Design a protein with these regions (language model features):
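Peripheral, non-AAA+ core regions of ATP-driven protein-machinery
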Residues: 1-9, 15-313
Length: 313
């Protein structure tokens, strides 16, 4: 790097394979990674070149090696995704020159990574044509970007002594809390049922605003009542059974309206701020109201289907 014209952009893949002759240790060790990173950063500052360091990550997505390297650089970005899905999420864990709540969505193609201009359309592209019980569309926000994704639930009678709880793409502890609230404040007896919850598309949801959508999918599966296909759900459920307002309500409603949804089941007064959105808001104050709303439509939507019936306490 020191010979010839100074480059404008330098990519090191990966920092764990670099070594310095002045450090008596093998490549990949803590001292070598730290020393190599320091030397490269000094070169970048002296030459004015932009430096991109590619590093290994652990199984839980954390940067492998010494944390001091993370403190030395200006920004830390990581890709999320798996081999079963074509999309990748680019998140910022650190950014000295901007916000860390932004997220980029890319699709892996034969020509490399392509930007996805409409991520919500990507995650909802494979929805079934007919309305089926146990599926609810969650109006979420990833960073500062609104994102609509389908949450799927299956509630089936258990064949073993202990009911099974399985969840993919959501926090298991969050599912356990929602189930407990549905039993305590919604009158739903779930102790004799296996519960499976899945976030379609392989996306992982972290925000508590998904509570209401997950609860709606669970109630829908248990009662056999299909949820309206033109509706979205969002809201945080408290231990008292109340549904609390969440941030970026206007952003969620605007994204839902853009994709053709006409109804939103959300806490009271979801349009706290922002420009008016052409979407009908259905206030949901507590889980008991949600259970009553879905159960009331069970007779119509369950016609011709056989499914488990709720046991009300």
């Amino acid at each position: 790097l020191g010979s010839g014209d100074a480059p404008k952009f330098v990519v090191i893949d990966s920092i764990q394979t670099m070594w310095s002759d002045s450090i008596e240790s093998a490549p990949g060790t803590v001292s070598q990674v730290r020393g190599s990173a320091q030397a490269l950063i000094r070169f970048a500052k002296a030459s004015g070149a932009a430096l991109l360091l590619v590093g290994h990550v652990t199984k839980d997505g954390q940067i492998a090696g010494p944390r001091v390297v993370e403190h030395m650089v200006d920004a830390v970005f990581s890709f999320e995704g798996d081999s079963a899905h074509a999309f990748r999420l680019l998140r910022a864990a650190k950014n000295r020159f901007g916000a860390t709540d932004e997220v980029g969505v890319f699709e892996m193609t034969g020509g490399g990574l392509d930007e996805v201009p409409n991520p919500s359309g990507l995650f909802l592209a494979d929805r079934d044509g007919a309305a089926n019980p146990g599926a609810a569309v969650f109006a979420g926000v990833e960073g500062a970007r609104p994102l609509l994704v389908e949450i799927q639930a299956l509630v089936a009678p258990t064949t073993f002594g202990t009911p099974r709880r399985a969840v993919v793409g959501w926090e298991p502890s969050r599912l356990a809390m929602v189930l407990a609230v549905l039993e305590a404040h919604g009158g739903m007896k779930l102790g004799q049922y296996d519960v499976y919850l899945n976030v379609a598309g392989g996306l992982r949801i972290m925000e508590p605003a998904a509570d209401l959508a997950a609860a709606a999918a669970l109630i829908s599966s248990l009662t056999g009542a299909s949820l309206p296909r033109d509706a979205v759900y969002f809201g945080e459920i408290g231990l008292s059974g109340s549904v609390r307002a969440v941030a970026h309500a206007g952003l969620r409603l605007k994204e839902a309206a853009k994709l053709g949804f006409v109804r939103a089941f959300a806490p009271q007064s979801p349009r706290a701020s922002g420009e008016p959105v052409n979407i009908a808001a259905q206030p949901i104050d507590n889980v008991a109201a949600l259970v009553a709303l879905i159960a009331a439509s069970a007779v119509e939507t369950r016609a011709g289907r056989a499914g488990p019936r709720p046991v009300m306490g």
